[in-house]
């Protein structure tokens, strides 16, 4: 079978994972103690479990996941929370002192003591898989553990499991709402380290998701749980085709083949529709056409950037629920007639479709309305370079004065790493510019004839 191991690093990673496992359990009919619900037992056997869960001899399902954090608080909440019976206690690994928002602590000093223990557990989970497909790594860019330890883990996974795909879900620092001053440092250092190790990185930024929750769900003050439940829907959609059947199934390697034109340009933009509150759901038709269109509106995208300023290189549309291929093709045909959505000229077709028949599930008493179909869009667009340039300029402001650098150097980092990471990111921005520019030159040539 095609198993996936989820690795959750730091506070953001662990809290997103909580929402994800809550959702997977609902989708597969697994109770918080790991045993099946009565109606699930009565239904046809479900073979999709094994992607995310391993079955023990007595019919209990255990998630194939590892929680790792350098401080115990967040993981202790899981250990005492509603799902404490679900997870394997040895797969919850927490240290004693946190990384204090410092990449160097997560990557060099504190993280170094925990990494072997984590990799040992990863090895045990991996040995339990018959056909491991790859890893999903959840972490934030801004925190110390997420950035430092996350990067260290990615490096070591490349050494131990070179050929397996590694997909990242990264919480990118929001442009306006920062949780720490040194986020730009941590983000650029971790991007530089993981750039060559990740096959595909799905970025989400808190501010964009806050706005989606406020606008579409009518929540005045969304909390992290609201945000994470929305992210969980996206993660679930991306992996749904591995777990349920459908007419167009997509596996992890297929994403990379279709979304990543060059190894470094692997940061797709994520959008999800419909995000709608229960009060409004009854008034919406929620047709395939509408859902597909709303994915291309900047308001529904999970990183603050404007795709109308960039060009699309490739787009994956993953439908769930009551969708027939004919409707999906019609929706895409309509999209292609719109002038607002521009593709680079070296990639004329550009759409990859996936359809999975399992309708989306919602958490009971959650904010999202129950809908019979949904779509998740992953698109590789040159507009995401806006996010990088915003981050780089913040980095430059601080680094020009060498502000806060002593904290990193004090933990054994070299100052040269900062400039090296910054140059790497500048190169990444240039890569994006060149991809967009290639198509510009083509247009000028055509105009002359």
UniProtKB/Swiss-Prot annotation:
<dbReference type="InterPro" id="IPR037103">
    <property type="entry name" value="Tubulin/FtsZ-like_C"/>
</dbReference>
<feature type="binding site">
    <location>
        <position position="179"/>
    </location>
    <ligand>
        <name>GTP</name>
    </ligand>
</feature>
<feature type="binding site">
    <location>
        <position position="145"/>
    </location>
    <ligand>
        <name>GTP</name>
    </ligand>
</feature>
<dbReference type="Pfam" id="PF03953">
    <property type="entry name" value="Tubulin_C"/>
</dbReference>
<dbReference type="InterPro" id="IPR018316">
    <property type="entry name" value="Tubulin/FtsZ_2-layer-sand-dom"/>
</dbReference>
<dbReference type="InterPro" id="IPR036525">
    <property type="entry name" value="Tubulin/FtsZ_GTPase_sf"/>
</dbReference>
<dbReference type="Pfam" id="PF00091">
    <property type="entry name" value="Tubulin"/>
</dbReference>
<dbReference type="GO" id="GO:0005525">
    <property type="term" value="F:GTP binding"/>
</dbReference>
<feature type="active site">
    <location>
        <position position="254"/>
    </location>
</feature>
<dbReference type="InterPro" id="IPR023123">
    <property type="entry name" value="Tubulin_C"/>
</dbReference>
<keyword id="KW-0493">Microtubule</keyword>
<keyword id="KW-0342">GTP-binding</keyword>
<keyword id="KW-0479">Metal-binding</keyword>
<feature type="binding site">
    <location>
        <position position="228"/>
    </location>
    <ligand>
        <name>GTP</name>
    </ligand>
</feature>
<feature type="binding site">
    <location>
        <position position="144"/>
    </location>
    <ligand>
        <name>GTP</name>
    </ligand>
</feature>
<feature type="binding site">
    <location>
        <position position="71"/>
    </location>
    <ligand>
        <name>Mg(2+)</name>
    </ligand>
</feature>
<comment type="function">
    <text>Tubulin is the major constituent of microtubules, a cylinder consisting of laterally associated linear protofilaments composed of alpha- and beta-tubulin heterodimers. Microtubules grow by the addition of GTP-tubulin dimers to the microtubule end, where a stabilizing cap forms. Below the cap, tubulin dimers are in GDP-bound state, owing to GTPase activity of alpha-tubulin.</text>
</comment>
<feature type="binding site">
    <location>
        <position position="71"/>
    </location>
    <ligand>
        <name>GTP</name>
    </ligand>
</feature>
<dbReference type="GO" id="GO:0046872">
    <property type="term" value="F:metal ion binding"/>
</dbReference>
<dbReference type="InterPro" id="IPR017975">
    <property type="entry name" value="Tubulin_CS"/>
</dbReference>
<dbReference type="InterPro" id="IPR000217">
    <property type="entry name" value="Tubulin"/>
</dbReference>
<dbReference type="GO" id="GO:0005874">
    <property type="term" value="C:microtubule"/>
</dbReference>
<keyword id="KW-0460">Magnesium</keyword>
<dbReference type="InterPro" id="IPR008280">
    <property type="entry name" value="Tub_FtsZ_C"/>
</dbReference>
<feature type="binding site">
    <location>
        <position position="206"/>
    </location>
    <ligand>
        <name>GTP</name>
    </ligand>
</feature>
<dbReference type="InterPro" id="IPR002452">
    <property type="entry name" value="Alpha_tubulin"/>
</dbReference>
<keyword id="KW-0378">Hydrolase</keyword>
<feature type="site" description="Involved in polymerization">
    <location>
        <position position="449"/>
    </location>
</feature>
<comment type="similarity">
    <text>Belongs to the tubulin family.</text>
</comment>
<dbReference type="InterPro" id="IPR013838">
    <property type="entry name" value="Beta-tubulin_BS"/>
</dbReference>
<feature type="binding site">
    <location>
        <position position="140"/>
    </location>
    <ligand>
        <name>GTP</name>
    </ligand>
</feature>
<dbReference type="InterPro" id="IPR003008">
    <property type="entry name" value="Tubulin_FtsZ_GTPase"/>
</dbReference>
<keyword id="KW-0547">Nucleotide-binding</keyword>
<keyword id="KW-0206">Cytoskeleton</keyword>
<dbReference type="GO" id="GO:0005200">
    <property type="term" value="F:structural constituent of cytoskeleton"/>
</dbReference>
<dbReference type="GO" id="GO:0005737">
    <property type="term" value="C:cytoplasm"/>
</dbReference>
<feature type="binding site">
    <location>
        <position position="11"/>
    </location>
    <ligand>
        <name>GTP</name>
    </ligand>
</feature>
<protein>
    <recommendedName>
        <fullName>Tubulin alpha chain</fullName>
        <ecNumber>3.6.5.-</ecNumber>
    </recommendedName>
</protein>
<comment type="subunit">
    <text>Dimer of alpha and beta chains. A typical microtubule is a hollow water-filled tube with an outer diameter of 25 nm and an inner diameter of 15 nM. Alpha-beta heterodimers associate head-to-tail to form protofilaments running lengthwise along the microtubule wall with the beta-tubulin subunit facing the microtubule plus end conferring a structural polarity. Microtubules usually have 13 protofilaments but different protofilament numbers can be found in some organisms and specialized cells.</text>
</comment>
<dbReference type="GO" id="GO:0007017">
    <property type="term" value="P:microtubule-based process"/>
</dbReference>
<keyword id="KW-0963">Cytoplasm</keyword>
<dbReference type="GO" id="GO:0016787">
    <property type="term" value="F:hydrolase activity"/>
</dbReference>
